[in-house]
Amino acid sequence: MSKFVPYPLFHDDMPIDISFVFESERPAGKHGFMHTAGDHFEFEDGTEARFWGVNFNGGACFPSHEYAETVADRLAKTGCNIVRFHQLDAEWDSPNIFSFSRGKRLGSTRELDPRSMERLDYLVYCLKERGIYSYLDMLTYRRYKTADGVAAAADMIDSTKYPFNCFDERMKELQKEFMSQLWNHMNPYTGLCYKDDPAFVMTEIINENDLFSKPNFTVEPYTSDFRRLFRAWLDRRGIEFDAEGCDLTAKDGVLAEFKTELEREYFAEMRDYMISIGVKIPITGTNWFFSDALTRAHVDMDFMD
């Protein structure tokens, strides 16, 4: 006799269903907006928030209506209560938030594709109805175009390899524009803008990209811009240091202090912007921690992922 119990994992169903345990938690958002309370998350009505969930990557964030219902049911049966929407802006997958289908080359990344958004809206609605919350990434794999007004866009085929999003003014403007478009988007199925829907509980500013783990300063004018910012920072503090000739990837204490401060300012600027447009949920900077310096840069954030 076999010692193993069959436990098949179907793509459209589950061999068990424990969704009845969480029936009283439907719809997601019934307890109000989530916030941080000391060392834990809490909803407006005082209910402590705890989550167990999954990532949806790239095109998986934009399923057909039929599959959105199927996958929401499947997740609910397992007791899953949160989905992180990741790589929404990934050009290498289709659909993505800027383009519903492959074909004509995108001239810019400054508009959300209405067909992609309609599918995302319905998926968010299906999850919400089953008591499943949503976590939204902001910047992940966005590939800037020349028409976006980004210098040397053609030289950065994979923008995730470079740390320029953290200090370039044009890239920061584009990030804010994207945030405004997404958070102010009205979901016709819930009747709420994303920023006004308590089914969204967390967000992060940028995925796996920072001045410490992505020390690739090989593209101009960004290398010169970074050295200019570094030199001005040194001058304000009266520190003697070779800002022009130093290795920008070196593990130097002075350079690390500057990067930490610059990263912290970037996180604060993006957080403050989201708050200014009405985002009400906890915000973090990025979702990984390669050094104590990067951890220190999160001191003003609501949580650390």
Spans of features found by a protein language model:
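Active-site mouth of glycoside hydrolases
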Residues: G29-M304
